[in-house]
């Protein structure tokens, strides 16, 4: 539910961390003088751990952020989404688990536990994740 007093929330429809969830106008962070809306308090906390990364990664979902203001020093990790929760973005500061010599990033410790139980299933599932096109990243 959006109120008339939050015009930015009307422009930004989706949470930049849980990219399939609608924003809650009461859950937001200030970033370089702009309000970025989230779907919940958990996303607010995660966002604050790596704001420049999340803004650059999900700038396509944030119409209030000018593309020229993105931090050019931020380098993306290869993995963009949690291996278990495919609609949740990860950053270099996310939970990490190594499997067969490769690092994988996760939304939570619960996601790591699920991954450990069926790693091959989640690795195959991640290869089919269609959420990447929502980020519209330039190569």
Give residue ranges: language-model regions.
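Bacterial N-terminal signal peptides
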Residues: 1-3
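Intrinsically disordered, low-complexity terminal tails/loops enriched in metal-binding residues
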Residues: 5-139
